[in-house]
Amino acid sequence: MVEFSTYESSSCTVWSSLFISGTGQKEYHLIMRPDCGGGFPEQYFALRKALGEFIEGEGSVRPIFMRWFLSDASNQLALVEDEDCAVSFIEQPPLDGTKVAL
């Protein structure tokens, strides 16, 4: 079974796909983009906040893999926090003109 939903925080949009196996195991795939203006720090921390809110709202879920899309990786990586999961960084600016997407 697959469920699709959209979550809007005050500064981000989150598109969620929930896959539920026959045994009840859940797997989420999220696409997140900031809706706020400003530079990379504001947009990055808005995404972090929205991710935290999503995880808190869903209960016992945790990230397994994150793929960050950065507009200027060489200058932005210093601000990115360490994660407790596998992470990849793609230096490809999001098409909507933002500085970062997840």
Spell out what each predicted region is:
Residues M1-A101:
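Short, polar/acidic, helix-capping and beta-turn segments at strand->helix junctions
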